[in-house]
Each structure stands twice: as structure tokens, then as C-alpha cells.
Amino acid sequence: MKFSFLRRYCIALALLGGFLGLSQAATPRTVLVLGDSLSAEYGLPRGSGWVALLEQRLAAEKQAVRVVNASISGETTFGGRSRLAALLAQHQPTHVIIELGGNDALRGLALDATRANLEWMTQQSKKAGARVLLLGMQMPPNYGADYGRRFAGLFQQVARSEKVALLPFFLKGVADIPDAQRLFQSDRIHPTSEAQPLMLDNVWPELKKIL
């Protein structure tokens, strides 16, 4: 009698565990990418940018993850901030990748404002139940060592204060190599198609940790 009860109890637990496992596996996940031209396929054939390659990699790994690319060329952190609430409500992402800030620096916007916008977007994403990955950027040496250091530090400060994931330099292995020019379009600002897999390889390990 005791054996029969124990056996039925174990079977019930196994069935429940299987049900929960299936439920979790079936739970849809959505990654929202909020970025600028580096994520919007500027100057590239459609479907060749790192975000499109991310979709392909997730599919190859049979991960049920939907990717929404809400990136716009020329976007600043202020622009991203103004659009974020509507994007969160519409797509209800489980993960948000924020790739913004480069255009703020190129336009000479105040660093304090950039940091405040990044913090706000991170906080709102977290309040919506999403896990956040910040993609850090660095400026060329001609902007000055002090400015470059302070700009790069913004991303570290936000990630640390908000306790979110950080990729310190999105263009590592692309913009910081001796022959970097070959990986950039003629404007020397936007990476080529050849650089996109390298950019994804930078993002992937950090994203995979929080998926």
C-alpha cells in the first residue's frame, strides 16, 4: 500500500515537472533592440546586419525567441527615450538591448544627459519586466582622451548602478584593430557587411547569459 502511494506520488511529480518544463519552453521570449544606424543596417543589404544574423543564430539553436529591431539611423539616447514606452507596451519584450549613445557624442550632447537617458531607459525596461543588455561605445582618439574616457565610462556607470549586463565595447575587433578601415564603409563610420558577424560575436556571449 505504501509502495503504491509512493509510486503514484513520484509519477505525479514527474508529470508536473514535465508540464512545467513544457510550459517554460513554450513561453515566448522577445528581444527588443533599441539602437541607431549600427543596428539599423545603414548602407547594408537588407538582412545582413548583426540583428538579422542574431535572428538566424537563435533559429539555428532552436531557441524560441522573437527579435524586434526598433533601431533608427541617427537615433540619440533622447530619441530612444521618447520611443521606449510605446515599444515596451507594444512588444512586451523579455529582453532589451540598448545600443545608443554614439550619436550623442558625435553631436556633442552633454554627457550627463546621455547618462540620464541611458539610466531612464534601463529603469523603464526593468520595470516592464525585461532584462537589459547595454552595448557600450568608445570614441575615436581625436575626440580627446579625457572625453573618450568619460564617454566610455557612462555605460559602465549605468550598468553598475542598475545592475544590468554590459558589453563594454560593441565594436571590439572591428574599430580597434590596425587595419580597421577595411571593415568600414566609405564614410569611415558605419561597419561593412563583413564586420556584422564580428559585432554579433561580441553581443552573443553577453546576451546568452541573460536569455
Regions found by a protein language model. Name each.
Residues 43, 68-77, 105-109, 188:
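Acidic/histidine-rich helix-loop elements
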